Amino acid sequence: MESLRGNTAQGPTNEEDYKNEGQLSRQTKCPAQKKSSFENTVVRKVSVTLKEIFTGEEGPESSEFSLSPNLDAQQKIPKGHGSPISRKNSKDNSDLIKHQRLFSQRKPCKCNECEKAFSYQSDLLVHSRIHGGEKPFECNKCGKSFSRSTHLIEHQRTHTGEKPYECNECGKAFSRSTHLSLHQRIHTGEKPYECSECGKAFSRSTNLSQHQRTHTQERPYKCNECGKAFGDRSTIIQHQRIHTGENPYECSKCGKAFSWISSLTEHQRTHTGENPYECSECGKVFSRSSSLTEHQRIHSGEKPHECRVCGKGFSRSSSLIIHQRTHTGEKPYKCNDCGKAFCQSSTLIRHQHLHTKE
């Protein structure tokens, strides 16, 4: 049995060593990884042996299973006498079983609530917290709780300001690896989420969901103050700040405050002059991704914003709003000098020049 416990650091390294020494490294390796034909033979035999030791199932070899045809009779392992190795290598074997599931895609751990399956019991335990509402991981700064320790770690970075994930292209840093992955699609142009209705593609699944509501006209998020409905949750949160007057995001350069962090980020580019969004057709650059999207419609001819009254299409939502005033008669822009009203702010500005000339 001592020969089976050979030193892993100085154990045999080739077939000749095995023949001469009759030893076997105790390191458990995965058969799915590439190896020489000799290594594959040894690992396959080790896997069968471990299966017999831990499950009692007999492998394809004889009941008295030898690790190598060159091992003498004293080095053979009789069935039922594997307990010392079992105790010694139980952790190695469990790690091997877990690792092999990556290749087999076997998911034996099934949720009783929703039938979702997992490779490991630990993953099932974490998943079950969705149904039970359990959030055992609490932030010691603000008291917010989470169902996963990884979510707590990510949250704590909002307090520490730590951003360990950096973009290799532009150097921008993020607190979450998922945010970095999403950001990198700006550089690669990858848009894996495609609309089944019109074929338009998006870099984020949330953007696809929001877009699909332009086809369904679904607006599930309703404001309790004014009854206005929205297609996505983030927009209603931003809208509600109109009622509360909350502007939590302040510019460190000029002190101007904003209700939305993306608005602050876009505003800060007026100080830095940064224009990170470039049109692939003509090379024109923009400080906002939305401005680039609207500009690209000049090249594509896309007009996704359609008037429900007359069916006329527009490339910008703001252009549709202005157009709709021709149907409603609304003229929200009024001249302070003569009281004349206009449906567009630009028309009011042109009109006011008449008074200044006078």
UniProtKB/Swiss-Prot annotation:
| The organism's place on the tree of life at top rank | Eukaryota
**Could you confirm whether the keyword Zinc-finger appears in this record?**
yes
Q: Where does the record place it?
A: Nucleus
Keywords on this record? DNA-binding, Metal-binding, Nucleus, Repeat, Transcription, Transcription regulation, Zinc, Zinc-finger
- Stretches the record annotates as Disordered: 1-38, 56-94
Q: Which family does it belong to?
A: Belongs to the krueppel C2H2-type zinc-finger protein family.
Protein name per Swiss-Prot or TrEMBL: Zinc finger protein 391
One annotated GO molecular function: RNA polymerase II transcription regulatory region sequence-specific DNA binding
Q: Per the record, GO CC terms?
A: nucleus
Signal sequence region: none
Q: Which function does this protein serve?
A: May be involved in transcriptional regulation.
Question: What ranges of residues constitute the C2H2-type zinc fingers?
Answer: 109-131, 137-159, 165-187, 193-215, 221-243, 249-271, 277-299, 305-327, 333-355
Q: Which stretches does UniProt call biased (Polar residues)?
A: 1-13, 22-38, 63-73
Coding gene? ZNF391
Which SMART domains is this protein grouped with?
A: ZnF_C2H2
Which residues does UniProt call coiled coil? none
> Which Pfam families does this UniProt record tie to the protein?
zf-C2H2
Q: Which Gene3D superfamilies match?
A: Classic Zinc Finger
InterPro entries attached to this UniProt entry? Znf_C2H2_sf, Znf_C2H2_type
The alphabetized list of GO BP terms reads:
regulation of transcription by RNA polymerase II
